Regions:
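Short catalytic/signature loops enriched in Gly
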Residues: 4, 144-148, 241-328
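Conserved ABC ATPase "signature" region
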Residues: 70-77, 128-148, 258
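ABC ATPase NBD coupling module
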Residues: 78-95, 121, 244-249, 279-285
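Hydrophobic anchor residue at the start of the ABC signature
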Residues: 115, 167, 178, 191, ...
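A short, proline-enriched helix->beta-strand linker immediately N-terminal to the Walker B motif
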Residues: 172-176
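P-loop NTP-binding/switch modules centered on Walker-like glycine-rich loops
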Residues: 183, 187, 191-269
Length: 328
């Protein structure tokens, strides 16, 4: 295994609301290795995006707060840095493609102004030099007539085009860690493939670069990732290599996700689905998060309603459920 690029230890990110404290990320620990693509999958509300925002120190406070934990990057705990020190890392060393392209761009500034800003700040380029590089990046992500489009406003771009602009901005500085939160949202499958290839090119150009890919699309995960984290209820439920996860999923929730994928060889008229909906994080409590979605004998707690510890079921394959459920 390569050297660790980022170590996340016992991360807790909570949101304090009138209805109570939402434990959006609750005691999460994992490593990101140099040169790897690590995927985080899970349903909406599982804590995927909050985890990524925590790494970049972008949790809105109030109501959010990183309560405790460590985020170690280059032997430095990012949670100990000042606001200005974090600004020197954000965008240059750790970049992010945000989930909402329709609202992530400033509507009153031209695309060129927003793209040039990061280059002027981190590389001390003048306006002309920054514009030239920004045009090259727009062309690289497949935006036609980039010399013209760079002087247009966000409302003149479609949702898919705005997403490509966001991706171009994130790749401007060849970051060590690219956090991609649903990077192919609003894109058709052809452009999805182009964007994923572009992200892989970044990793190939910079041998020690890593990608944290957040998605709900297991097909994208299978195509791009080296390892996968499955999240639910603000906690990690399973971690494994991509081959191991698809070949031998251990957690009941992971198995249910896999069974919900349509397969060509299966002649079924109806897709399998998990029972119910993801409950509010406020209503999950500290016990087992799955009791409302599984029958007691199939639930990770096996009917005890107690939350389970994450343990190593086999080498580099971690799972959070009763040990009696595991057959490796």
């Amino acid at each position: 295994m390569s050297k660790k690029l980022v170590q996340i230890k016992n991360l807790k990110t909570y949101f304090h609301t009138e209805a109570g404290t939402a434990k959006a990320v609750d005691n999460v620990s994992f490593d990101i290795y140099k040169g790897e693509v690590l995927g985080i999958v899970g349903e909406s509300g599982s804590g995927k995006s909050v985890t990524s925002l925590s790494i970049n120190r972008l949790i809105p406070n109030p109501p959010g707060e990183i309560v405790s934990g460590e985020i170690i990057y280059n032997n430095t705990n990012l949670l100990d840095l000042s606001y200005d020190e974090m600004k020197d890392i954000r965008g240059k060393e750790i970049a992010m493609i945000f989930q909402e392209p329709m609202t992530s761009l400033n509507p009153v500034l031209k695309i060129g102004v927003q793209m040039n800003e990061i280059l002027i700040k981190h590389y001390d380029l003048n306006e002309e030099e920054a514009t030239k590089k920004s045009i090259e990046m727009l062309e690289a992500v497949g935006i036609p007539s980039p010399e013209q489009r760079i002087d247009e406003y966000p409302h003149q771009f479609s949702g898919g085009m705005r997403q490509r602009v966001m991706i171009a901005m994130a790749l401007q500085c060849n970051p060590s860690l690219l956090i991609a939160d649903e990077p192919t949202t609003a894109l058709d499958v052809t452009i999805q493939a182009q964007i994923l290839d572009l992200m892989m090119d970044l990793k190939d150009k910079r041998k020690d670069a890593a990608i944290l890919l957040i998605t709900h699309d297991l097909a994208v995960v299978a195509e791009t990732c080296d390892r996968v984290i499955v999240m639910y209820g603000g906690e990690i439920q399973e971690i494994a290599t991509i081959e191991e996860l698809f070949k031998n999923p251990l957690h009941p929730y992971t198995k249910a996700l896999m069974n919900s994928i349509p397969h060509m060889e299966r002649k079924t008229k109806r897709l399998k689905a998990l029972k119910g909906m993801v409950p509010s994080i406020l209503k999950m409590g500290d016990g087992c998060k799955f009791c409302s979605r599984f029958e007691p004998e199939e639930c990770p707690c096996m009917g005890t309603k107690e939350n389970q510890e994450l343990f190593e079921a086999k080498k580099n394959h971690f799972v959070r459920c009763k040990k009696e459920m595991i057959s490796v």
